[in-house]
A protein has these predicted regions:
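Membrane-proximal helix-turn-helix segments that form the acceptor-binding/catalytic region
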Residues: 93, 101-120, 219
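Acidic donor-binding loop of glycosyltransferase active sites
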Residues: 219-233, 246
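Conserved donor-binding/catalytic core segment of Leloir-type glycosyltransferases
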Residues: 121, 157-175, 181-189
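Short alpha-helical segment that forms part of, or immediately flanks, the ligand-binding pocket
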Residues: 215-216, 238-243, 257
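Short N-terminal targeting/anchoring amphipathic segment
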Residues: 53-70, 84-86, 226
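Active-site proximal beta-strand in glycosyltransferases
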Residues: 3-4, 61-63, 76-96, 121
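Acidic anion/phosphate-binding donor-loop and adjacent secondary structure
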Residues: 97-98, 132, 143-163
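Short hydrophobic beta-strand element within catalytic cores of glycosyltransferases
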Residues: 238, 247-250
């Protein structure tokens, strides 16, 4: 099959540092290739360019990984009428409607629940249930939970920092690092955005790691912390921590896909 994966066009794919959605798209394309399919990535914020690039080949399936592009789905279909089309929303507050107006998500969500033409690949069962509750067409809803690839991670059975906890993620209000920065033995890693009171000059902030550095050093730690106030489902970084052998401490929003009875969750 010839499959197109449409990214947001905000950062490069594969990402050099932060970028969970971009990492997932890259992993999808890689896995598709290993299964004998063609996984073509189109990653630009320019809607006209997306449509132009898609029109240059014949695709069997097109998966748009950015809900903001809902407004060009019909144009995409007009260039590829024989292809199956799907869209996924990676918006973290789908199940919190009070947040939608603040983020300009109202129109997007309205389209997602009224759309009866294209598949909506839900990133989590939590999102699926939210759409279902608001009467989205069930024949267009499919749950497609994201996983984490394990092959490239360096595994250390005995971590070099067993008493340290890593808080890995973009430094932003939603991830709430600023709330916990004063706690000893937590080290923070992630892209700094200057949107909270988080002190980037503190000793506990290690800066932003490259993707390659993350692969090598996540297992330096005994566990990972993520107490965000909204997530699509369980974030990729938590799944990466688990396959790397770390225990995790997470908020309810980051625990949707986890078995909370396990001793390391």
């Amino acid at each position: 099959m010839n499959i197109a994966l449409v990214g947001p066009g905000i950062i490069e794919i594969p990402p050099k540092g932060w970028g969970a959605v971009e990492s997932l798209i890259w992993d999808y394309a890689t896995e598709l290739g290993e299964l004998g399919h063609e996984g073509t990535i189109i990653n630009t914020p320019d809607r006209a360019q997306i449509i132009r690039e898609l029109s240059e080949e014949q695709y069997d399936f097109i998966h748009v990984h950015y809900d903001v592009f809902y407004d060009i789905m019909d144009y995409i279909w007009s260039t590829q009428p024989a292809a199956k089309l799907a869209i996924s929303s990676h918006y973290p507050y789908i199940d919190q409607p009070d947040r939608h107006p603040y983020d300009g998500y109202d129109k997007i969500y309205k389209w997602l629940i009224e759309n009866d033409k294209y598949y909506n690949f839900c990133i989590s069962y939590k999102d699926y249930e939210t759409y279902k509750k608001d009467n989205a067409p069930l024949n267009k809803l499919l749950v497609c939970p994201n996983g984490a690839q394990h092959r490239d991670y360096n595994f250390e059975e005995k971590p070099s920092k067993p008493d340290k906890t890593i808080y890995l993620g973009k430094i932003e209000p939603r991830k709430r690092q600023y709330v916990y920065q004063a706690i000893p033995d937590i080290e923070f890693v992630g892209h700094y955005t200057n949107t909270t009171s988080f002190d980037k000059d503190a000793k506990s902030y290690l800066g932003e790691w490259s993707h390659q550095h993350k692969l090598q050093h996540v297992t330096d730690y005994g566990n990972m912390l993520l107490l965000s106030d909204g997530e699509n489902g369980t974030p990729l970084v938590i799944k990466e921590a688990l396959i790397s052998g770390l225990g995790v401490v997470v908020s309810k929003y980051a625990a949707h896909d986890l078995d909370k009875s396990l001793p390391f969750v």
